[in-house]
Amino acid sequence: MPQFDLRGIQIAKYVNTNGVITYTDRQTAGDAMTANMELRYAEGRLYAESTLAEYMRKATGGSISLGVKYIPNAAQKIMFGSREKQRTVGQKQITGLVLGGKTTSAYVGVGMYAPDMIDGVEKFTAVKIAKALFGPPSMTLQTAGENIVFNTPTTTGEFLADDSTDQDMIEVAICDTEEDAIAWVTAALT
Protein backbone atom coordinates (compact mmCIF):
# COMPACT_ATOMS: atom_id res chain seq x y z
CA MET A 1 0.00 0.00 0.00
CA PRO A 2 1.71 3.18 -1.11
CA GLN A 3 0.90 5.80 1.51
CA PHE A 4 1.38 9.39 0.44
CA ASP A 5 0.55 11.41 3.54
CA LEU A 6 0.27 11.13 7.34
CA ARG A 7 -2.46 12.55 9.54
CA GLY A 8 -4.04 12.52 12.97
CA ILE A 9 -1.36 11.19 15.35
CA GLN A 10 -2.99 10.60 18.72
CA ILE A 11 -1.84 9.14 22.02
CA ALA A 12 -3.78 7.85 25.02
CA LYS A 13 -2.81 6.58 28.47
CA TYR A 14 -2.37 2.80 28.50
CA VAL A 15 -4.41 1.08 31.23
CA ASN A 16 -4.00 -2.63 32.08
CA THR A 17 -6.68 -4.07 34.36
CA ASN A 18 -5.88 -7.77 34.84
CA GLY A 19 -5.05 -8.22 31.16
CA VAL A 20 -7.94 -6.09 29.87
CA ILE A 21 -6.42 -3.17 27.99
CA THR A 22 -8.16 0.20 27.77
CA TYR A 23 -7.01 3.73 27.08
CA THR A 24 -7.89 7.07 28.67
CA ASP A 25 -7.15 10.76 28.10
CA ARG A 26 -6.77 10.52 24.33
CA GLN A 27 -4.88 13.57 22.99
CA THR A 28 -3.40 14.77 19.76
CA ALA A 29 0.37 14.28 19.70
CA GLY A 30 0.72 17.30 17.41
CA ASP A 31 0.34 18.01 13.72
CA ALA A 32 1.69 14.91 11.96
CA MET A 33 4.91 15.13 9.97
CA THR A 34 6.61 11.71 10.20
CA ALA A 35 6.07 8.32 11.82
CA ASN A 36 8.41 5.35 11.70
CA MET A 37 7.65 1.99 13.29
CA GLU A 38 10.05 -0.90 12.94
CA LEU A 39 9.52 -4.34 14.43
CA ARG A 40 12.34 -6.12 16.23
CA TYR A 41 12.62 -9.91 16.15
CA ALA A 42 14.15 -12.74 18.12
CA GLU A 43 15.57 -15.34 15.77
CA GLY A 44 16.67 -18.91 16.17
CA ARG A 45 18.32 -21.39 13.84
CA LEU A 46 18.63 -25.13 14.28
CA TYR A 47 21.21 -26.98 12.25
CA ALA A 48 21.03 -30.74 11.79
CA GLU A 49 22.95 -32.95 9.40
CA SER A 50 25.06 -29.93 8.40
CA THR A 51 22.07 -27.95 7.08
CA LEU A 52 19.61 -25.44 8.39
CA ALA A 53 16.77 -27.65 9.62
CA GLU A 54 14.57 -25.12 11.41
CA TYR A 55 14.31 -21.37 11.50
CA MET A 56 12.14 -19.32 13.81
CA ARG A 57 11.50 -15.59 13.87
CA LYS A 58 9.25 -13.99 16.46
CA ALA A 59 8.33 -10.32 16.93
CA THR A 60 9.45 -9.05 20.34
CA GLY A 61 8.70 -5.33 20.05
CA GLY A 62 10.10 -2.48 18.07
CA SER A 63 11.18 1.10 17.78
CA ILE A 64 8.91 4.04 17.05
CA SER A 65 9.55 7.69 16.25
CA LEU A 66 7.00 10.45 15.77
CA GLY A 67 7.82 13.80 14.19
CA VAL A 68 5.29 16.59 14.69
CA LYS A 69 5.04 20.36 14.29
CA TYR A 70 5.05 20.64 18.10
CA ILE A 71 3.96 18.39 20.97
CA PRO A 72 1.07 19.91 22.95
CA ASN A 73 1.60 20.29 26.70
CA ALA A 74 -1.26 17.88 27.49
CA ALA A 75 0.43 15.15 25.42
CA GLN A 76 3.85 15.86 26.99
CA LYS A 77 2.38 15.42 30.46
CA ILE A 78 0.92 12.04 29.49
CA MET A 79 3.85 10.74 27.43
CA PHE A 80 6.85 12.05 29.35
CA GLY A 81 5.47 12.67 32.85
CA SER A 82 6.18 16.40 32.56
CA ARG A 83 4.73 18.65 35.22
CA GLU A 84 3.69 22.27 35.07
CA LYS A 85 5.57 25.00 36.88
CA GLN A 86 4.56 28.66 37.04
CA ARG A 87 6.92 31.61 37.28
CA THR A 88 6.06 35.23 37.82
CA VAL A 89 7.62 37.51 35.23
CA GLY A 90 6.71 41.13 35.90
CA GLN A 91 2.96 41.04 36.42
CA LYS A 92 2.43 37.81 34.45
CA GLN A 93 2.28 34.16 35.42
CA ILE A 94 4.06 32.08 32.78
CA THR A 95 3.55 28.32 32.83
CA GLY A 96 6.32 25.99 31.70
CA LEU A 97 6.85 22.24 31.71
CA VAL A 98 9.49 20.56 33.86
CA LEU A 99 11.33 17.29 33.29
CA GLY A 100 13.62 16.14 36.08
CA GLY A 101 15.30 13.31 37.90
CA LYS A 102 11.98 12.04 39.23
CA THR A 103 10.19 12.31 35.88
CA THR A 104 8.98 8.98 34.54
CA SER A 105 7.48 8.39 31.11
CA ALA A 106 4.24 6.41 30.95
CA TYR A 107 3.03 3.76 28.52
CA VAL A 108 0.66 5.05 25.85
CA GLY A 109 -1.28 3.72 22.91
CA VAL A 110 -0.60 5.48 19.61
CA GLY A 111 -2.90 5.86 16.62
CA MET A 112 -2.66 7.57 13.23
CA TYR A 113 -3.83 7.22 9.66
CA ALA A 114 -2.38 7.68 6.20
CA PRO A 115 -4.11 8.22 2.86
CA ASP A 116 -2.92 5.63 0.36
CA MET A 117 -3.64 4.24 -3.07
CA ILE A 118 -4.75 0.62 -3.53
CA ASP A 119 -5.28 -0.52 -7.13
CA GLY A 120 -6.01 3.02 -8.27
CA VAL A 121 -8.51 3.73 -5.48
CA GLU A 122 -7.79 6.13 -2.62
CA LYS A 123 -8.11 4.43 0.77
CA PHE A 124 -6.92 5.22 4.29
CA THR A 125 -4.61 3.00 6.33
CA ALA A 126 -5.24 3.36 10.08
CA VAL A 127 -2.58 2.15 12.53
CA LYS A 128 -2.60 1.47 16.26
CA ILE A 129 0.46 0.75 18.40
CA ALA A 130 -0.88 -0.96 21.53
CA LYS A 131 1.82 -0.10 24.08
CA ALA A 132 4.70 2.35 23.60
CA LEU A 133 7.07 4.27 25.84
CA PHE A 134 8.64 7.52 24.63
CA GLY A 135 11.35 9.84 25.83
CA PRO A 136 11.30 13.62 25.42
CA PRO A 137 12.68 14.85 22.10
CA SER A 138 16.08 16.45 21.90
CA MET A 139 16.14 20.21 21.47
CA THR A 140 18.06 21.65 18.54
CA LEU A 141 18.19 25.43 18.44
CA GLN A 142 20.13 27.56 16.02
CA THR A 143 20.38 31.18 15.03
CA ALA A 144 18.61 32.42 11.91
CA GLY A 145 20.78 33.02 8.89
CA GLU A 146 20.06 33.65 5.22
CA ASN A 147 17.70 30.68 5.18
CA ILE A 148 15.02 29.89 7.73
CA VAL A 149 15.34 26.40 9.20
CA PHE A 150 12.48 24.95 11.21
CA ASN A 151 13.56 22.57 13.97
CA THR A 152 10.63 20.38 14.95
CA PRO A 153 10.45 17.73 17.68
CA THR A 154 10.83 14.04 16.99
CA THR A 155 10.17 11.79 19.95
CA THR A 156 11.49 8.24 19.89
CA GLY A 157 10.67 5.21 21.94
CA GLU A 158 10.01 1.53 22.06
CA PHE A 159 6.82 -0.44 21.59
CA LEU A 160 6.15 -3.87 23.00
CA ALA A 161 3.37 -6.42 23.32
CA ASP A 162 0.46 -5.31 25.45
CA ASP A 163 -0.52 -7.23 28.58
CA SER A 164 -3.54 -8.99 27.06
CA THR A 165 -3.52 -12.74 26.43
CA ASP A 166 -3.07 -12.02 22.69
CA GLN A 167 -0.04 -9.77 23.34
CA ASP A 168 -1.01 -7.30 20.60
CA MET A 169 1.61 -4.90 19.25
CA ILE A 170 0.41 -3.35 15.98
CA GLU A 171 -3.05 -3.28 14.42
CA VAL A 172 -3.67 -2.01 10.89
CA ALA A 173 -7.03 -1.40 9.18
CA ILE A 174 -7.81 -0.25 5.63
CA CYS A 175 -10.71 2.22 5.61
CA ASP A 176 -12.71 3.48 2.64
CA THR A 177 -13.03 7.06 3.88
CA GLU A 178 -11.08 9.53 5.98
CA GLU A 179 -14.03 9.74 8.38
CA ASP A 180 -13.86 5.95 8.88
CA ALA A 181 -10.10 6.14 9.54
CA ILE A 182 -10.55 8.90 12.14
CA ALA A 183 -13.37 6.93 13.82
CA TRP A 184 -11.26 3.74 13.78
CA VAL A 185 -8.31 5.45 15.49
CA THR A 186 -10.66 6.96 18.08
CA ALA A 187 -12.27 3.56 18.75
CA ALA A 188 -8.87 1.82 18.93
CA LEU A 189 -7.69 4.22 21.64
CA THR A 190 -10.63 3.79 24.03
Model features per residue range: what roles?
Residues 9-12, 32, 110, 181-185:
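Generic hydrophobic, helix-prone segments enriched in Leu/Val/Ile
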Residues 13-14, 113-115, 175:
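Assembly/interface hotspot detector across virion components, adhesins/toxins, and nucleic-acid enzymes
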Residues 1-80, 131-149:
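Solvent-exposed edge beta-strands and adjacent loop segments
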Residues 9, 92, 99-101, 170-175, ...:
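Hydrophobic transmembrane signal anchors and adjacent membrane-proximal interface regions, especially
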Residues 132-190:
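Mixed-charge, glycine-accented linear interaction segment located at domain edges/termini
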